[in-house]
Amino acid sequence: GDVYKRQGHAALINVQRICDYVATGLTFDQAIELVRASSLYTVHTPVPAGHDYFDEGLFGKYMGGYPSKMGISWDDLMDLGRNNPGDKGERFCMSVFACNTSQEVNGVSWLHGKVSQEMFSSIWKGYFPEESHVGYVTNGVHFPTWSATEWKQLYAKYFNESFLYDQSNPKIWEAIYNVPDEEIWKTRVTMKNKLVDYIRKQFRETWLKNQGDPSRIVSLLDKINPNALLIGFGRRFATYKRAHLLFTDLERLSKIVNNPDYPVQFLFTGKAHPHDGAGQGLIKRIVEISQRPEFLGKIIFLENYDMQLARRLVSGVDIWLNTPTRPLEASGTSGEKALMNGVLNFSVLDGWWLEGYREGAGWALTEKRTYQNQEHQDQLDAATIYSILETEILPLYYARNKKGYSEGWIRSVKNSIAQIAPHLSLIHI
């Protein structure tokens, strides 16, 4: 049967498959051709930490008995995991082995496909990167899982009944333009209130336990304002995600969050890998900043990030913020989940957003790097975020009509759903 490897971690399954074919009487060359013809491999990140390398000694401790079963030498097996076969000093790479034993390799967005072609180009010497068998399949999301019940009910009310079976049909999604603005606004308000209630209920006990001073915690919880613009940031705290970017200029950020005419609050959540000291340091810094008087109740870090909290966030905030270092965001899917719930994206043009972004349906930071120096680039991107918040996002959100909502904001929500969502749904029967 066919085998699909979603990460390099699973690559060694093809060692066993080759052994099994050789045991039936095939030669190694015949066996590896069969294995390649029935193997697909998805690479999920260009970040080095996502690609396992093993020293020959450690690899041999566990894999030393396999070459004889495969009908090859130990060096032959090692070379299948090396960019430069024959280089005794090169470690065995699971990702290289996955490429060498798979018919097709794919990244998880158009840009990531291009990055992966360059990253693996040394495997296929003598070929241009675009000539390799590395392509892309942009990640999507499972609409029934990540759309809130309220949104599914709204879609069922206004969309063609075939929507359940053909969620990638743009014509069906265009029916969102027929939904009254008031109904979309009401649904958004409902989801925000649910998020705020969830936070107050779930985190009162946690924060009291971990942060002491009950009066301060109660005050903080009371400051969470469902009428303010809520901006969410929830993901793994890997350094390339740049969770720190918003805090580059604290004086300017303080002016933004304390503007009485345009109230805005930021909700941060996520976890760092246990061995990622830098990621843990980012969380620590955000928590410390959130406890300063000028940011108390304006910058909020939510502990114990899990699927339930993620589901509440992607349906309850107004804007989903994503600030990765270009081009290290392979795809990202949290913004796709948010979009299904009428949440607008504000992100660097990287990963899925490079393909998804449409003018008038969210906001974007350019995909191009202005500076090679990352610190300078961070400063520029932070200034751009502040500027877009001050001059575009906040004025649009608070341009309220007599009925209490922003017609321009609802127009952007409708554009986002109609023009982007059908390209992200996984269901098409």
Model-derived segments and their meaning:
Residues 1-427:
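Catalytic cores of carbohydrate-active enzymes across secretory and cytosolic contexts
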